[in-house]
Amino acid sequence: MKGIILTGGHGSRLYPSTLATNKQLLPVFDKPMIYYPLTTLIENGVVDICIITNPNSTSNFKKLLGDGSHLGVKITYKVQKEPNGIPEAFVIAKSFLNRDDGVALVLGDNIYYGANDILTDAFLNFGSGATVFGYRVEDPERYGVVEMSGNKVLSIEEKPKKPKSNYAIPGLYLFDYDVIEIAENLRPSKRGELEITDVIKAYLRDDSLNVFKLPRGTVWLDAGTSSSLFDSSAYVQAIEKRQGIKIGCPEEATYNQGNISKTELRKLIKGIPNCEYKDYLSNILKYE
């Protein structure tokens, strides 16, 4: 499976912090925001990743992540000139995708924690069609909502006034190659954008849409506003301080996946300046 991280847009909800930088380069506690979705993909076996960003941010992402080789992955960069909606990512990344591979799309400001088994099951067993996830929320009318029976989707609604369930669809999706044709044939909504809900509904009409319910205790954070960015940082800090582990650490994730060797991790650590992050990575080798 290949992966796409969507980091386009203007980050207007985080103005003025995003005047000089891309939203996904802002810190969520102790690391750049993009580290979190990148780690989600790596933890679930994805090693071929496309980062789609706006025209002004490519060089900064390349400075941060390079071609991914130090992490044992391959990172490709493509540009979304205007924020025309999530589905445009599949059109932009058409040359990156292969017919025989599924693709995982994760939004660059989304953070997931505590659902590793469910996500890994969904990634490993993905064959065709599309897979979304259901996350229980208190206020489903603010989200795209999935009504389900087991792993079968009954309906999809976008910000319904009277939701049929209290399960929102977070910004992580699995699709087969057909998603490109579906995205290419979409028409903009009243907002003037292509809508990911319309892509999902196309699979629902074809009876090829599955859903995995994220279990109780799973954390899904959207760090796309000033308040949610602060809350996300506070949550990550609390977990890391209490448990002594890092959330969203791609170096640790890729080492655990076997993408880099112990020698390669040591070399990577050597290139990091003296800091708490370096100490954490060093302790991975020290205490294993």
Question: Which ranges hold each PLM region?
Answer:
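Conserved N-terminal catalytic core of the sugar/cofactor nucleotidyltransferase
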Residues: 2-5, 13-16, 26-27, 31-107, ...
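Short, conserved catalytic or adaptor-binding loops enriched in Gly and charged residues
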Residues: 66-72, 147, 202-204
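Catalytic-core segments of class I nucleotidyltransferases/pyrophosphorylases
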Residues: 104, 120-124, 152-252, 256, ...
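Generic C-terminus detector
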Residues: 255-288
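A structural signal for short hydrophobic beta-strand segments in well-ordered beta-sheet cores
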Residues: 25, 146-148
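Conserved donor-nucleotide/metal-binding helix-loop-beta segment in metal-dependent transferases, i.e.
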Residues: 114-141
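Short coil/turn connectors at secondary-structure junctions
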Residues: 1, 46-47, 72-74, 99-102, ...
